[in-house]
From Swiss-Prot:
UniProt KW keywords: Cell inner membrane, Cell membrane, Lipid biosynthesis, Lipid metabolism, Membrane, Phospholipid biosynthesis, Phospholipid metabolism, Transferase, Transmembrane, Transmembrane helix
Physiological role: Catalyzes the transfer of an acyl group from acyl-phosphate (acyl-PO(4)) to glycerol-3-phosphate (G3P) to form lysophosphatidic acid (LPA). This enzyme utilizes acyl-phosphate as fatty acyl donor, but not acyl-CoA or acyl-ACP.
Phylogenetic classification of the source organism: Bacteria, Pseudomonadati, Pseudomonadota, Gammaproteobacteria, Pasteurellales
TM annotation in the entry: 4-24, 56-76, 80-100, 115-135, 154-176
Pathway(s) it belongs to: Lipid metabolism; phospholipid metabolism
Protein name: Glycerol-3-phosphate acyltransferase
Reactions it catalyzes: an acyl phosphate + sn-glycerol 3-phosphate = a 1-acyl-sn-glycero-3-phosphate + phosphate
Organism: Haemophilus influenzae (strain ATCC 51907 / DSM 11121 / KW20 / Rd)
Class of the enzyme per the UniProt entry, highest EC level: transferase
InterPro entries, per the entry: G3P_acylTferase_PlsY
Subcellular location: Cell inner membrane
GO CC, any one term: plasma membrane
Primary subcellular site in the record, as a coarse category: membrane
Assembly with partners or alone: Probably interacts with PlsX.
Amino acid sequence: MSLFALFYMLFAYLLGSISSAILICRIAGLPDPRQNGSHNPGATNVLRIGNRKSALAVLIFDMLKGMIPVWAGYYLGLTQFELGMVALGACLGHIFPIFFQFKGGKGVATAFGAIAPISWAVAGSMFGTWIFVFLVSGYSSLSAVISALLVPFYVWWFKPEFTFPVALVCCLLIYRHHDNIQRLWRGQEDKVWAKFKKK
């Protein structure tokens, strides 16, 4: 990697470190997502403890954190491997944010945003997998884990030169879902729409 690419990856990490869930909850007067619900600063938890508008705002912001640096990297002349590492940097920032004691979200939306400029076919396959599993199961976490397991194969099929960095991103996603995987195994994971059924 070039020196410029390393600094640009650092920029992507810093951008990823801006936790939209925490900031939007503060602005909207909602509880701290790190202390309520699933204790995860992400769109799904904001939906649990807040409302659809706030959750949608978090989702869009988190996707843009990954999408903007990768998309801009194309025009800055970064190599394919460097673009993949920029995507990894953005996801690392979201998961381990320097501005919030390195305690961040799961990284799914940011990973989707980072992968989209790399390949819309891969992004579409990832989104389709997530939606299918979610509609069948009702578990956002299960949808994310299965998507993360399959995305490296989608990348290998459509854009093989990005397989290694994207596989690293997916390993991070699965690692961040280890608590969810244990709850799923024990049958203790909450379905996303459970909140709305209680109303």
